[in-house]
Structures are given as C-alpha cells and as structure tokens.
C-alpha cells in the first residue's frame, strides 16, 4: 500500500515566526502535543505545512498576510515528505517567490506555469487542498466540517476520496470532443453547401445554354436591334446639338465696359453730391469750416460751381443712358454663354448614354454569339462533384452517429450516472464507519447519509432530528467520526495510507471529557500514524511522545522541545 507521510518541516518568517527557523521532525513519534498561549504560534506549523504543499494559507486569509509582519520578507518553508516510496522535498517562499520540488534528489522541471506545476504536483502525491483539509487536518480555523459544506462541496469531496474525479476529466474530454464534432460538422456543412452551389452553377449554365438556343436568339436579336436604333438616335441628337453649338457666336464680352461706365458714373455722382453740398453752404451762410472766411449767397464762386454742377449732371445722364444700353448687351451675352454650356452638357450626357447603349449592344451581341456556339457539356465535372458530395454526406452521418454515442457517454458521466452508482455502492460503508466511530465515542444515536449527502439522525425512542439541532459537543463527535471515516475511505479506495493527522484545538472546543477520552482511544489505535494535537489546554505530557511548546520571545515565536 502506498503511503502519504510528512517527515519534516522547517519554516521561518511566517506568521509570528521570525528569521530564526523552527525545525520539526514530523515522523519522530506517534503522538505529539503542541501547546502555547493564544497568539503564541502553536498553529503556525499547520500554516507552514499547508503553504508548503499547496501554496495557500490554511486559514481564510490572503497569502500575503501570512508573511511575518515585522520582517515582511523572506518567508520560507521547507518540507520533506514521502509518497509511494518516493522522497519529496518542497521549497516554497514569498518575497522572493520560490517554488521548487525535488523527487529522490532530482529537481523537477518547472517549465510549465506555476498553476500547472502545482496541479501536477497534487496529482503526483494524491492529495488536493480540499482533501487535505478534510482528512489530514481537523481544526477550528480554516476548517469547514463536512456537514457545514454545501451539497455540491460535499459531493466534490467524496468524489475526490473515491477517485471518481477521473470521470470528471473524462466528462471534460467528452464535452471537448463533442465541441470538436460540432466544429467539424459546421465545416462539413459549409463544404457541402459549396459543392451543392458548384453543381447548381453547372446545371444553371446548361439551362442557360439551352435557353440561349432557338427562340432565345431571336429575342436577343430584337434587343440588339433596339439598342442599335437607340444608339443611332442619340448620335443624331448629338450631331444636331453640335451644329447649334457652332452657330452660337459670342461677341466681345461687354461686362468690362459696363463695369467701367458704372465706375465713371459713380465718380461723377460723387462730384454732383460735393457741388450740391458747397452750394448749400453758401446759401445757408456762415463761416467756412476750412478757411474760416465768411460765406454768402452772392459770392461769384457760387455761379462757377453751379455751372460745373450742370456739366456733371449732363455727363451723368449720358453715362446712365450708355450703361443701360450695355446692360442689355451683357444680358444677351450671358444668355448665349448659358445656352452654349447647356448644349455642351447635353452633348456629354448623350455621349455617355450612347456609350452605355453601345456596351449593352456588345454584350447582347456576345450573348448571341455564345448561343450560336457549340454546346458545352459539364457532365464530367458534375459527376466528380456529386462523388465529393456523397463522401461529405457519409462523413457527416458518421459525425452525427458519434455525437449520439457521445451523448450517451455524457448521460453516463452525469452525477446520476456512473458516479452516482459508485457513490451509491459506498454509502453503506460510509454509514458503517461513521457509526463505528460514533459508537466508540458513546453516541446514543445512529447517523446516516443518503446518496445526495443529506443526513438522517435517529435515536431510540426519540424523533428524527438534524445535525444543526445538536450541541457543539455532539457536532464535534460527528465531525470527528466523519474525519476518521473519510481517512478510512481514502485509504481503501486509493490504496494510500495517510500517516499524518493534525488536530488543531479540537479538544479545546465543545467536546466534553468523555468525548476527549473517546478521541484519545481512536488516536491511540493509529499506531502507524503521526498525530499532532495542537491545544492550549492542560494535558498529561506522559501521554505523548514529545511536547513542543511555542512561546513568544519579544515579537517572535520560539520552540521548546520536551
């Protein structure tokens, strides 16, 4: 029988332990008592072993919180153990991170990720974190009694113990294969659609060739004649538009002369306004704002300015008349320009339409020539494609059949399938062992669980009741009975003897003196095991092979062996 045995642990800078390491030989005696005051570090060994094996704290704290709060670095756990006649050395630390494993003195390859490396290690020693906390350790911190677990968690634990986890792996592989079959089926469907489409194209081509023969040629010829007529009509319209375009002769653009006369008229108008302003000043009298001389209506200069004003008015009238004449010419010029632009645009549009019509006529002509050509037979191509299609359909049928078979496997691998059958087979053994240990602890009731891990507790002459209705002491009896039952089952199923048991403050809880005596009886029967009792109660040291006392010196825990 294989053996899971912890030999030695050395740890430093973890919890209250500082840089001076604590070194414990774990397989030295059958029973070891570990005592100390609260906060003295008596449970730190358990944290160190758990971290060494699984890289996790035993209690429900973050990994970084177990580093010694004073030194804050160089947490290191070294663990020596045996499994299946192989000697393991595990070295694990934080700040810096360290994770090394040696088997029989040979260091294992760490090329995989730390998570994969850890999973492979747990498989190799036949122990998971959850199993360790249920069958190696019974404690008040970080330990959840089996009866306090959820139904899925209870099932998972028992499945691990019965080693039916392989079925879960098979289920994963099976589901992966189903997904792969679905993917292959989708690819085949796409291929099938492609082949069917190719066959369809060939058949359509044959039909198209048939349609292009006979009356179809005449229809195409009519289309060609209509397109040719349309092209000739467009050509005639283009020629007519070109002729009209050539007949439009543009004279010199009068816009510049029109604008120049406008500017001259504006200047003369400005002079007229200026003369009128000066005449008004002399008419109103007063003082000249420029030279300060006296202004009066009879000044001779008024007559001269009046003459100039008449000349400007005459010139302005002539320019206005000329400007009006030029405005007519400008409008005519612009109208001719627009007409030419419209004709040019119309010519371009009709040329494009004519080109498109000619292109259509060419295509129809090509279709006529194709219809008149020799008929092309695609029988060989269609035969090859049909053969390929038959092969695809056969492969798809095989996939559908395999999916059906894998569906059956899926049903078998469900909780109600093979796993359920295995669990059903072991339930009577579970109940037998549980009640065996309860009898040793002088319990006056019968405890049983069903295939769904629901408990049933009966006592002679009393009503049926539940785990939750018990006192803490009775719950402790049941928890301990379950612990030893799971250890027994794990050993029977795996063929692995678990040589280590750690009980953390179990005897300090609600268990009474009779319960403690019963537990001691069970522990004394484990002659091949190394049992560690962690307690802050008074115990008889003579009942133990060694006594490890943990105490604080300053801020750090030290160990005294007696």
Curated annotation (Swiss-Prot):
The protein's enzyme class: hydrolase
GO terms of molecular function: ATP binding; ATP hydrolysis activity; exonuclease activity
Keywords, in A-Z order: ATP-binding, DNA damage, DNA repair, Exonuclease, Hydrolase, Nuclease, Nucleotide-binding
Amino acids binding ATP: 36-43
Pfam families recorded: AAA_23 (PF13476)
Annotated EC: 3.1.11.-
GO biological process: double-strand break repair
Subunit structure: Consists of two subunits: Gp47 and Gp46.
Family note: To phage T5 protein D13 and to yeast RAD52.
Protein name as annotated: Exonuclease subunit 2
Species name: Escherichia phage RB69
Gene that this sequence comes from: 46
């Amino acid at each position: 029988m294989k053996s899971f045995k912890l030999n030695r642990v050395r740890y430093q800078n973890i919890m209250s332990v500082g840089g001076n390491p604590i070194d414990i030989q774990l397989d030295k005696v059958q029973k070891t008592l570990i005592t100390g005051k609260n906060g003295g570090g008596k449970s730190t060994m358990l944290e160190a072993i758990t971290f060494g094996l699984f890289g996790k704290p035993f209690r429900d704290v973050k990994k970084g919180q177990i580093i010694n709060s004073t030194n804050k670095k160089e947490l290191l756990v070294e663990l020596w153990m045996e499994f299946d006649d192989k000697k393991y050395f595990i070295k694990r630390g934080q700040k810096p991170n360290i994770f090394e494993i040696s088997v029989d003195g040979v260091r294992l390859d760490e090329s995989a990720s730390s998570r994969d490396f850890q999973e492979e290690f747990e498989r190799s020693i036949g122990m998971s974190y959850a199993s360790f906390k249920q069958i190696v350790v019974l404690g008040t911190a970080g330990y959840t009694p089996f009866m306090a677990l959820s139904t899925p968690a209870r099932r998972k634990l028992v499945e691990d113990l019965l080693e039916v986890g392989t079925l879960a792996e098979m289920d994963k592989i099976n589901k992966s294969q189903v997904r792969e079959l679905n993917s292959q089926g989708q690819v085949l469907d796409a291929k099938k659609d492609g082949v069917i489409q190719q066959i369809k194209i060939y058949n359509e081509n044959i039909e198209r060739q048939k349609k292009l023969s006979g009356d179809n040629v005449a229809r195409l010829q009519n289309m060609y004649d209509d397109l040719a007529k349309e092209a000739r009509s467009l050509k005639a319209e283009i020629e007519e538009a070109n002729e009209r375009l050539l007949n439009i002769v543009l004279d010199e653009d009068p816009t510049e002369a029109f604008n120049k006369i406008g500017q001259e008229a504006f200047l003369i108008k400005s002079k007229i306004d200026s003369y009128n302003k000066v005449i008004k000043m002399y008419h109103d009298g007063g003082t000249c704002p420029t030279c300060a001389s006296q202004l009066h209506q009879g000044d001779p200069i008024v007559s001269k300015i009046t003459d100039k004003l008449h000349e400007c008015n005459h010139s302005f009238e002539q320019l206005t008349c000329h400007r009006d004449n030029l405005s007519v010419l400008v409008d005519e010029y612009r109208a001719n320009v627009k007409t030419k632009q419209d004709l040019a645009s119309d010519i371009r549009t009709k040329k494009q339409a004519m080109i498109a019509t000619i292109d259509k006529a060419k295509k129809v002509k090509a279709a006529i020539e194709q219809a008149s050509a020799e008929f092309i037979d695609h029988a060989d191509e269609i035969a090859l494609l049909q053969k390929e299609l038959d092969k695809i359909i056969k492969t798809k049928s095989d996939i559908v059949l395999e999916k059906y078979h894998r569906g059956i496997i899926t049903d078998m691998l469900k909780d109600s399938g093979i796993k359920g059958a295995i669990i059903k087979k072991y339930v009577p053994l579970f109940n037998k062992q549980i009640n065996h240990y309860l009898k040793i602890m002088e319990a006056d009731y019968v405890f049983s669980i069903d295939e769904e891990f629901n408990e049933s507790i009966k006592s002679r002459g009393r009503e049926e009741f539940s785990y939750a209705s018990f006192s803490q002491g009775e719950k402790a009896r049941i928890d301990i009975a379950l612990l030893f039952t799971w250890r027994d089952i794990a050993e029977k199923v795996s063929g692995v003897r678990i040589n280590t048991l750690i009980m953390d403050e179990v005897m300090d809880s609600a268990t009474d003196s009779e319960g403690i005596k019963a537990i001691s009886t069970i522990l004394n029967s484990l002659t091949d095991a190394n049992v560690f009792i962690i307690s802050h109660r008074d115990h008889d040291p003579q009942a133990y092979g060694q006594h490890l006392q943990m105490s604080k010196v300053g801020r750090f825990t030290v160990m005294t062996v007696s």
